[in-house]
Amino acid sequence: MLDVKSFQLQSFLPLPYEEVLAPRLKRAHEKLQSGSGAGGEFTGWVHLPRDYDREEFARIQAAASRIRANSQALVVIGIGGSYLGARGVIDCLCSPNYNLKRKDTPNIYFVGNGLSSDAMGEVLDLVADVDFSVNVISKSGTTAEPAVAFRFFREALEKKYGREGARERIYATTDKARGALKSLADSEGWETFVVPDDVGGRYSVLTAVGLLPIAVAGVDISALMQGAAEMMEACTEASFQCPAWRYAAIRYELYRAGRSIELLACYDPAFRFMAEWWKQLYGESEGKEGKGLFPASVEFTADLHSMGQYIQEGKRLMFETVVRLGPSDRQLTVPADEADGDGLNFLAGKSLDFIRDRAMEGTLLAHTEGGVPNLIVETSGRTPADLGQLIYFFEYACGLSGYLLDVNPFDQPGVEAYKKNMFALLGKPGYEDRRAQLESKLEG
């Protein structure tokens, strides 16, 4: 089972902070469990690992099997919570080099998360001469980046297979009853999957939003959900026995002590997009009303050679949360070299994992001694069940953290500001007055 460990935090935290925070955490816990807190209408994810729709889950598995059988590539169109979780899980469980590996599952390309002609054009080129399918993910169907991307890939599908053939290769994950994408999918006869009304995008990786692409990659999504269910059960414990309580409490107390940045560190490159998912989860949930930790991430040991100097001796703004994944199935040992010109024969016969763990321990000690608090989130393995536990753990701790800050962890009103400006500057009907104001500001 996943565990949270503090690392020599005594000098950084008031003791006993657990006793002081316990009543507030209990209230936050009760709000999550009952859906009675701010944004409670979006807490469907809390019991999702137990209550998910089994019929739709079976349809997800069937669709994934069809895609694996008839496609050499799957194009996943989505932005933010509509793609980060799936990409994170696939990278973590399959490989960040997934598309380069020899395998019996399709390549998976993620688009619609930006507005780059080069990036979009490259993926269009990559799928031009192979059989491919598309999974477009959008609650409304009107979010600019994925909606624009879908136009390109729908056109490519219809040119390649005809409108009828394309119909069998488009899968829409969207609202169950309304919205532009739902209306279009129903009129065209595409298979649809549901973005639940009571689950926000950044909490949706364990719904069809994440599960369909993850299943196409060959990951056992039943085991993923089982792991999440195990952590859900652990999080029903209204005490510091719950790992999410410990994590939420430590980060809140460090925030109160003046730490404004949380640096998520992992020693495995496969975790990079899980860290990107985590950044959105915590950034959108906490960052409002002038409050919240700024979530950032680093990949060690690589970033010890770029950011390590600042972490060690720069301004004392941050603390580190180190994610330690369980043992790897693959073990490489350092070969001996008779000449020993690099002086590294003292490492001969030792595994890379052993060396990495000593690097981690040395870094924990150095950064702590340099005034940077550290805590460790540790999984017992690297299986789908382990990652399911980790996903639910971060989600539950995030909900607790938002309520500790007295903010709504389930809305994101600030995201609309750039959208309104962008639409006005692009000439969207109804934004004429705003466009004139913005153009005047840009000229000034």
Residue ranges and their predicted role:
Residues 377, 381-444:
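C-terminal helical/tail subdomains of lipid-metabolizing enzymes
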Residues 65-238, 424:
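Glycine-rich phosphate-binding loops that contact phosphosugars or nucleotide phosphates
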Residues 1-68, 336-346, 434-444:
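Extended, charge-enriched "interface" segments that sit outside catalytic cores
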Residues 59-72, 123-131, 251-260, 311-316:
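Glycine-rich phosphate/diphosphate-binding loops that line cofactor/substrate pockets in enzymes
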Residues 82-85, 117-119, 142-145, 178-182, ...:
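Flexible loop/turn segments at secondary-structure boundaries
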Residues 159-321, 326, 414-444:
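Active-site phosphate/pyrophosphate-binding segments
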